[in-house]
Amino acid sequence: MARPDMGGPKTGGFGGPRSGGFGGGGGGGGGFGGGGFGGGRGGDRGDRGDRDDRGGDEGGGRRGFGRRKVCRFCADKALKVDYKDQGQMKYFLTERGKIIPRRISGNCAKHQREVATAIKRGRMLAILPYTVGQM
């Protein structure tokens, strides 16, 4: 039995079995407005053409990404990740105290995990900041 305040079957309420979401409206499809379609991808974007017909410069080759970064710990085997070395760990922190991601620091996955663990250890021992205080 449907409650009168919730809307019965096929009504535009928010709780009926065919209400199509919160917004009433008959039509099929889920979503929040009921929608007029069954959730299909409408063709209102127009013909965008093939990827290679979009223009741009015709030169092949690489984009100007610059030099590939190498992991400093893999390059120099004598260098170790040490949570007690504040200067080394600060290199991998932003000025806000966040850990710099791998794609920016250039670390390999193994050493990025070690750096992240070392930074977290340093934070627990109050060697490194969690955040930088606002003045």
From Swiss-Prot:
Keywords: Ribonucleoprotein, Ribosomal protein, RNA-binding, rRNA-binding. One of its GO terms (biological process) is translation. GO terms for molecular function: small ribosomal subunit rRNA binding; structural constituent of ribosome. Residues 42-61 have a biased composition (Basic and acidic residues). Residues 1-65 are annotated as: Disordered. The keyword Iron does not apply. One of its GO terms (cellular component) is cytosolic small ribosomal subunit. It comes from the Bacteria. Residues 9-41 have a biased composition (Gly residues). The keyword Ribosomal protein applies. Pfam families: Ribosomal_S18 (PF01084). HAMAP family: Ribosomal_bS18. Binds as a heterodimer with protein bS6 to the central domain of the 16S rRNA, where it helps stabilize the platform of the 30S subunit. Part of the 30S ribosomal subunit. Forms a tight heterodimer with protein bS6. Belongs to the bacterial ribosomal protein bS18 family. This is Small ribosomal subunit protein bS18. It comes from Anaeromyxobacter sp. (strain K).
